[in-house]
Amino acid sequence: MRSYEKSKAAFEEAQRVMPGGVNSPVRAFKSVNMDPIFMERGKGSKIYDIDGNEYIDYVLSWGPLILGHSNEKVVKEIQKAAEHGTSFGAPTELETELAELVIDRVPSIEIVRMVSSGTEATMSALRLARGYTGRNKIVKFEGCYHGHGDSLLIKAGSGVATLGLPDSPGVPESIAKNTITVPYNDLESMKLVFQEFGDDIAGVIVEPVAGNMGVVPPVKGFLEGLRELTETHGALLIFDEVMTGFRVDYNCAQGYFGVTPDLTCLGKVIGGGLPVGAYGGKAEIMEKIAPSGPIYQAGTLSGNPLAMTAGLETLKQLTPESYREFSRKADRLEKGISEAAEKNGIPCTFNRAGSMIGFFFTNGPVINYDTAKQSDLGLFAEYYKGMADEGVFLPPSQFEGLFLSTAHTDDDIEHTIKAAERVFERISRSR
């Protein structure tokens, strides 16, 4: 059994100065019934806590670190950029360079605006959709999390699901009434919504692979159906690729599935571990944003040189071969853990998309929020604690996915499988 005494003391101190002792709710580890583990440093696929424990990290700062921790080239470029200045409040060529790289790789994006977070990206995209169409209603999907903007905290996933909340107090009814929620992967319900509200719907926002109720890929025809419905009714299709962008595929989820939205929201990977977000799409829509158009959006640190530098270096290192390797390693991890669970009589369902992996303690299939919630959360908490003691750091929530990086080795994968075997054996014996 590992010692977490320093983390325990650090958490007690943190609770005196921060709400719940953390700056994002899922970091409180409430759903796994333990105190949060405080981290000190990371290198490659490994992360180290303040008690000196080492872990193979499958959280990767909730997705951004696709090259692993402290990638030497990324760190070097950030250091060089910082020496020139951390922020100017004026344009830099770095912004243009990253924008050109994003436009080159993301099928839907002709023009892109940089912001400082994924939440900013989705909020700004919704304002743009409303301003462009002259309509007010937005459709989202149950269990999909698009940041903490008021109009999107309706039946959200991620940390909201982890805390067992349907939505958040503080969201005015006047805002909530313009958000329509539909079960994920349910195209028939979408057709009914458009039959009733089609002329009032500004846009449909969707995670092309849901990543905030665990990992839940789209069923066949779902994304294609959304594209057809929105085009028919003059609404915008918005892909929230903050998580899936450059994780599912070299050309993002839209490239992988062959469905092109009107607007795309990005974040995480494109900042290489620094705060960033972006939204982009067709030129005729994006040109409505100030200063070229009347729809306002601004940000003090948008496009700051450190985030642009980290994002540029990260994307430059990713190649189509990177994604083939992700798939190979994810296949092995899924097969090994599935076999270990089956051997010990533990129900386990895997979902996967590129370097995103989700597994649920249920017999499945898991295709939406309702089926995701059927997972045995008590069993997940047992598994989580056991894997932490075995030196494997997982997301402390059933409703979050695992991430792979280019730094994960075959030895890391085998160590993780062996750890899962031991943990499942202990759980099986105790039941």
Swiss-Prot record:
Subcellular localization: Cytoplasm
GO BP terms, alphabetized: protoporphyrinogen IX biosynthetic process
EC identifiers of the protein: 5.4.3.8
GO molecular function, one term: glutamate-1-semialdehyde 2,1-aminomutase activity
Family matches, as Gene3D superfamilies: Aspartate Aminotransferase, domain 1, Type I PLP-dependent aspartate aminotransferase-like (Major domain)
Xref: InterPro entries: 4pyrrol_synth_GluAld_NH2Trfase (IPR004639), Aminotrans_3 (IPR005814), Aminotrans_3_PPA_site (IPR049704), PyrdxlP-dep_Trfase (IPR015424), PyrdxlP-dep_Trfase_major (IPR015421), PyrdxlP-dep_Trfase_small (IPR015422)
N6-(pyridoxal phosphate)lysine modifications at: K268
Pathway membership, UniProt: Porphyrin-containing compound metabolism; protoporphyrin-IX biosynthesis; 5-aminolevulinate from L-glutamyl-tRNA(Glu): step 2/2
Pfam families: Aminotran_3
GO CC field: cytoplasm
Entry keywords, A to Z: Cytoplasm, Isomerase, Porphyrin biosynthesis, Pyridoxal phosphate
Reaction catalysis annotation: (S)-4-amino-5-oxopentanoate = 5-aminolevulinate
Cofactor: pyridoxal 5'-phosphate
Subunit record text: Homodimer.
UniProt similarity note: Belongs to the class-III pyridoxal-phosphate-dependent aminotransferase family. HemL subfamily.
Protein name: Glutamate-1-semialdehyde 2,1-aminomutase 2
Organism of derivation: Bacillus licheniformis (strain ATCC 14580 / DSM 13 / JCM 2505 / CCUG 7422 / NBRC 12200 / NCIMB 9375 / NCTC 10341 / NRRL NRS-1264 / Gibson 46)
Name of encoding gene: hemL2
